[in-house]
């Protein structure tokens, strides 16, 4: 920890590829002084003497050699991202240029930043809580509008505020019980269990709402695990190609062309899909194809969504019956493909369960795809997600901490129901308090903090 506050770190904050602009960032007590050793302005002015939140035009130099023409941004702590003195050098974005400037800063007293160290310093300096720090990583990694908005909501402190509210209530009642136990002559806890239960139930209800958001949260962050199922030659690979907008899967008239799982990522109306094209479901003596069929069933069992493609130009058979049995009770959409041909299967077919939406499509003619997209969006997010009041837990670590806190409050209610001594309430209340603190980082261990930030990119 001592090294953290006594050292000045430097890293490249932009992508390591040739581009118009590159940014090299420094943070720490010597940031301005190190910058002065390599910066030369037109008026020979020292950066150390300049005001915070100002931008200065000049050159980065190594002795008499000019390295690049730059704009240098100054931010004095605590009014910076890290809470420390920060310098951002905006240079030309050539890979060699930014690396050369970074090497020059290190030569003049900075040390290379560890992965995620800027955000880690922001957390340790109180600029962000841990849920907000994790939101920074999620924001950078977001692949769709929902993931972006969820990360922004968390970065604004929505989770922090909700968790802090719960912790304050728990701490208040824990403190009251502890005080009463220490001074029973002046403070009575007779009948307090009933009062406490109302508060605990209220907090648990708020926790349950957060826990109920976890499935949607995972889908927002990671995408919908989607499996395309159907018999051979039903048009599964054609559908994948249409959704991707490119010929990714091989399409032929030969049954059994797809023998393994082909996985791709795509966005449909703001929703990320991790979509898998699988081998056609049928009885087969071919050993390799049979492995593919078994794997298709295995993936379907773990899927968030199944797109069951039926060749509607042919009657249903025993293989369709097997697939319908396979998807029973799951989240699925039935797609009647080849609607441009004489249809032998219709939406009204009695074999098709009413629990599933049924859509007529033609992968060949790109018909019905928009209806599929709308149905998918409605199926997962009731047509729209809002981030004004709703909070979505997208982080497994946060979910686990919430579950631990919820279990602790369940124990409090059990103790109240069993009329246990009040000190039992206090123990479990503190367990809940500390579990919630793991979400915001107020009660988390240093090793876990290091592990979390090690997953960040170098310049963040």
Where are these regions (language model features)?
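Short glycine-/polar-rich loops that comprise or flank the Walker A/P-loop
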Residues: 19-21, 53-55, 302-306, 329-332, ...
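Generic enzyme active-site microenvironment
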Residues: 275, 309, 335
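Conserved beta-strand segments of alpha/beta enzyme cores
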Residues: 111, 272-274, 357
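C-terminal-of-GTPase-core extension/linker across diverse P-loop GTPases
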Residues: 3-12, 16, 145-267, 284-286, ...
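A glycine-rich (often HGG/GG-containing) alpha/beta subdomain
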Residues: 1-149, 153, 157, 333
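Switch I (G2) and immediately adjacent beta-strands of P-loop GTPase domains
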Residues: 56-68, 72-76, 256-284, 302-305
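Inter-motif core of Ras-like GTPase G domains
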Residues: 289-313
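Short glycine-/small-residue-rich Rossmann-like dinucleotide-binding loops
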Residues: 244, 279-280, 304, 311, ...
């Amino acid at each position: 920890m001592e090294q953290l506050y006594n050292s000045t770190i430097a890293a490249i904050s932009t992508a390591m590829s040739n581009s118009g602009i590159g940014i090299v960032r420094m943070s720490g007590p010597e940031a301005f002084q190190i910058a002065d050793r390599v910066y030369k302005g037109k008026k020979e002015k020292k950066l150390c003497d300049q005001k915070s939140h100002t931008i200065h035009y000049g050159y980065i130099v190594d002795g008499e050699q000019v390295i690049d023409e730059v704009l240098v941004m100054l931010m004095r702590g605590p009014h910076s991202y890290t809470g420390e003195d920060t310098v951002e050098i905006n240079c030309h974005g050539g890979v060699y240029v930014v690396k050369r400037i970074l090497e020059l800063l290190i030569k003049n007293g900075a040390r290379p930043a560890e992965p995620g160290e800027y955000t880690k310093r922001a957390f340790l300096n109180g600029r962000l809580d841990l849920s907000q720090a994790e939101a920074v990583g999620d924001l950078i990694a977001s692949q769709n509008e929902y993931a972006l908005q969820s990360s922004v909501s968390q970065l604004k402190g929505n989770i922090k505020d909700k968790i802090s509210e719960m912790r304050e209530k728990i701490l208040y009642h824990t403190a009251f019980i502890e005080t009463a136990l220490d001074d029973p002559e002046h403070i009575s806890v007779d009948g307090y269990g009933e009062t406490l239960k109302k508060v605990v139930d209220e907090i648990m209800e708020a926790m349950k709402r957060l826990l109920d958001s976890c499935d949607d949260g995972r889908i927002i962050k990671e995408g919908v695990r989607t499996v395309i199922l159907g018999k051979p030659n039903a048009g599964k690979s054609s559908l994948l190609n249409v959704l991707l907008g490119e010929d990714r899967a091989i399409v032929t008239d030969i049954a059994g062309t797809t023998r393994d799982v082909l996985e791709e990522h795509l966005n449909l109306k703001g929703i990320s899909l991790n979509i898998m094209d699988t081998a056609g479901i049928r009885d087969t003596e071919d050993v390799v194809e049979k492995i593919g069929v078994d794997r298709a069933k295995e993936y379907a069992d773990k899927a968030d969504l199944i797109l069951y493609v039926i060749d509607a130009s042919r009657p249903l058979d025993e293989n369709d019956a097997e697939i319908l049995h396979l998807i029973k009770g799951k989240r699925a959409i039935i797609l009647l493909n080849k609607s441009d041909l004489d249809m032998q299967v219709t939406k009204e077919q009695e074999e098709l369960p009413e629990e599933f939406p049924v859509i007529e499509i033609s992968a060949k003619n790109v018909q019905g795809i928009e209806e599929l997209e709308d149905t998918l969006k409605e199926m997962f997010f009731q047509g729209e997600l809002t981030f004004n009041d709703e909070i979505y837990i997208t982080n497994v670590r946060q979910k686990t901490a919430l579950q631990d806190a919820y279990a602790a409050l369940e124990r409090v209610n059990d103790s109240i129901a069993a009329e246990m001594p009040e000190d039992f309430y206090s123990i479990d209340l503190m367990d809940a308090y500390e579990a919630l603190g793991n979400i915001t980082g107020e009660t988390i261990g240093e090793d876990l903090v290091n592990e979390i930030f090690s997953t960040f990119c170098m310049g963040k």
